[in-house]
Swiss-Prot record:
The keyword Membrane applies. GO terms for cellular component: photosystem I; plasma membrane-derived thylakoid membrane. The lineage of its organism: Bacteria, Bacillati, Cyanobacteriota, Cyanophyceae, Synechococcales. Its main location: membrane. May help in the organization of the PsaE and PsaF subunits. The keyword Cell cycle does not apply. The gene is psaJ. HAMAP family: PSI_PsaJ (MF_00522). Keywords: Membrane, Photosynthesis, Photosystem I, Thylakoid, Transmembrane, Transmembrane helix. It holds the Pfam family PSI_PsaJ. It comes from Synechococcus sp. (strain CC9311). It is found in: Cellular thylakoid membrane. This is Photosystem I reaction center subunit IX.
Amino acid sequence: MKKFLTTAPVVAAIWFTLTAGILIEWNRFFPDLLFHPMG
């Protein structure tokens, strides 16, 4: 359990960084696809 508590925040930080990076890259190449439903 102690090992899980130390690895979970690290995995979460990496996951959020990857997700944010993918969204930023996707928005840079396909801005219309990302924002079209909201507009």
